């Protein structure tokens, strides 16, 4: 009979997978074979959604900016265009935070964008 070796490493590997499967339901929690496939699937979703989160936040900031800019008589796209023409380099996250926490400051920025747009139309 062949001598079994590597029991410490095998146990550690199985233990690591079962630890990651904590909170899963049914056999997926305690049986190694099912836990392994469930953990791999969960990790794949985790990877995907970490990438998706960036776009989700960008969409949120754009939605907030659209609402805030319409209060000042601009659409979102015209606001961004006006900011570029005015040479104001604030990213969407900072503009969104400004619109929420510093409405007066955002009003000044929107006014600058509006002036830059009007100047480009006239000249």
From Swiss-Prot:
Function according to Swiss-Prot or TrEMBL: Binds directly to 23S ribosomal RNA and is necessary for the in vitro assembly process of the 50S ribosomal subunit. It is not involved in the protein synthesizing functions of that subunit.
Coiled coil spans: none
GO biological process, one term: ribosomal large subunit assembly
Gene3D superfamilies for this protein: 6.10.160.10, Ribosomal protein L20
Protein name listed in UniProt: Large ribosomal subunit protein bL20
InterPro entries from the UniProt entry: Ribosomal_bL20, RIBOSOMAL_L20_CS, Ribosomal_protein_bL20_C
CDD domains in the cross-refs: Ribosomal_L20 (cd07026)
GO molecular function list: rRNA binding; structural constituent of ribosome
UniProt-listed PANTHER family: 39S RIBOSOMAL PROTEIN L20
Organism from which the protein derives: Chlamydia muridarum (strain MoPn / Nigg)
Keywords: Ribonucleoprotein, Ribosomal protein, RNA-binding, rRNA-binding
Record-stated family: Belongs to the bacterial ribosomal protein bL20 family.
């Amino acid at each position: 009979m062949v001598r079994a070796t590597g029991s410490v490493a095998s146990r550690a590997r199985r233990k690591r997978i079962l630890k990651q499967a904590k909170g899963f339901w049914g056999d997926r929690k305690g049986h190694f074979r099912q836990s392994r496939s469930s953990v791999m699937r969960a990790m794949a979703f985790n990877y995907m959604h970490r990438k998706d989160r960036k776009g989700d936040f960008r969409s949120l900031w754009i939605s907030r900016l659209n609402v805030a800019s319409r209060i000042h008589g601009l659409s979102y796209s015209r606001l961004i265009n006006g900011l570029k023409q005015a040479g104001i380099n604030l990213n969407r996250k900072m503009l969104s935070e400004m619109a929420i926490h510093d409405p007066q400051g955002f009003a000044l920025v929107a006014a600058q964008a509006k002036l830059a747009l009007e100047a480009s139309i006239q000249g």
